[in-house]
Amino acid sequence: MPGTGLGRLAKRMTAAAAVFFISTSAVLPAQAATAPAAAPPGVPAALKAERAITTVDNGNLHTWWHDNGVFSPATPTQSSEVRRSSFYDVQVAQANQPQKLYDAFSYMSIPRSGKGKIGYTEEDGAEFSSDARLTMSWSSFEYAKDVWVEVSLRTGQTISSADQVQIRPSSYNFEKQLVDADTVRIKVPYSDAGYRFSVEFEPQLYTAYNDMSGDSGKLTTEAAGNRPIHTEPRNSMMVFAEPKLRGEQKERLVPTEESGSIHYPEPGEVRNLNSVSEEIIYFRPGTYSMGPDYHAVLPANVKWVYLAPGAYVKGAFRFLHDTQSQYKVTGYGVLSGEQYVYEADTNNSYHHLSGASNCHSSCVKMLQFASADAEQKLDLQGVTVAEPPYHSFVVYGNEQTFHMNVENYKQVGSWYWQTDGIELYKGSTMKNTFFNANDDVLKMYHSDVTIDNTVIWKNENGPVIQWGWTPRNIDNVNVANTTVIHNRMYWKDVKYNTCIFNSSSHWEDMGSTTKADPNTTVKNMRFENTAVEGMTNCAIRVYALSDTENIHIKNFNIGAWNGLEWTSQVSHLKRYTNSAGEKVTIGNEVPDGNGLALENYSVGGQVIEKTGGNSSDYQLGRLGFDGENWENWNAWKSAP
């Protein structure tokens, strides 16, 4: 939040001081420190001198700070604290005043929030990220004109050229300048959509490998004898440059007294939201904590939760009732699930899921809604959801009447399995978002859905785009401008639920080929401008459970295949049957143009063509589609 405090530590310190820093949980301002577990590799060995913090809030730029920020790279924070990045500092200047820099708080997430496995020993999906000591930092600000963003590396590692810093998505092509040996300056032009991008210093890059053990292999950072999967920063740094709201947008997305009655929680412990009498809950800048054994189950009168820029809320919200016609969750604040254990079970005192429970019904979700038979709408805008302990967003009830408008949403620190992206319901739109997810990211289960401008950082589990798991009726889906900047999908065996595009086999029995329904149809889905930066495991696997027509994938570009054998990277197009042996159909693509179309699908810059000698399973295209479906797909290069 806006304020003054202590900022950068000195460019160089004595070795003794550096050792002291990495051995403690450094707090700003100074307060009692706690000794953490072993510090991650790359924890600052050379620190920067403290100076006064300066933030700004004018018509063109808004940054904020948390005076209770703590350096805690390996252990949980206290309820009253916000974890500050141990690896990066961020400052922002208006482009016409480049020397007038303002501080933007750099948040940080670590696997399991440093808690370890509490109350369970089974796998939770965070094993590799925890063992490899990965972290994710991010910084947000609002802007209305071009800015310069300075990102400084706190580790003592140095660069000698701005070319040693990569911005992803690389298509942004931002101007970069070297400021000094650990700082790069990035020109971010104003856009009504904003920008969400990764800043990647070369000394921070590492490669994840498959150790080739067992059926699937396991991820490791050891190169010897292993196969490369993907290269990414060990300690990532995301920048969220968000448009400053004005006019009608501000009126729609920022509550005032005219919007309804407002409850303003006080910073600190917040465990009384189940009984508020107002219509709107407004979190002002500050730190709020619900604790590990509570989440807000909101009364029927609450229609809007607003998280102001600089609000940091440790908790989750459940809109229990289905009586409101218009819901809103908006604001550039943070909603963090860091205090919950993985699969926190509300039927088991918020401990890890008990054997008697079903996580879909009883586990904490960061945002949960109930839908009625009457038409309902949700505006979900601006919020950063951090460290979800399970699904980040669900709606239970009538899925055909709940319509969503999602804008400038971000999801970070998704270390656990089942930390999906967002399922969009019938008639919904989503644009200008960032997802770090460890399960299905874009879930295309409903008709009349439009998605545009999505940046994705994909962890191991699940595919990027999913429309399977059960037979469905889907019509009219349009997804454009999707960039996968990183992914760690690594399996050496052929999984049913992976790749960039996927329609998985049935969730009840993924090995079954007899759970399809020819009375359902998936049709008229268009995916345009999908870019995968770096290496990945496979392009598309469709195990059709419904009749399928007119699936058009245009301008799908993969940087490279990972280091596994082609047999691990093969794409599939299969048709399954119902229990009576009736097989679903796929539309005829050659010549009718009603099947699966791959227009300008490329790998490493080479376009894959069905007649070009590069499309087969063992060739560059890796298209191992069933022979019976030969007429149901095509791959070709179209004119620019």
UniProtKB/Swiss-Prot annotation:
Efficiently decomposes water-insoluble glucan as well as dextran. Residues 1-32 form the signal peptide. GO terms for molecular function: dextranase activity. Residues 248-269 are annotated as: Disordered. Keywords: Glycosidase, Hydrolase, Secreted, Signal. Optimum temperature is 42 degrees Celsius. This is Dextranase. It comes from Arthrobacter sp. (strain CB-8). Its main location: secreted. It is found in: Secreted. Gene3D superfamilies: Dextranase, N-terminal, Single-stranded right-handed beta-helix, Pectin lyase-like. The lineage of its organism: Bacteria, Bacillati, Actinomycetota, Actinomycetes, Micrococcales.
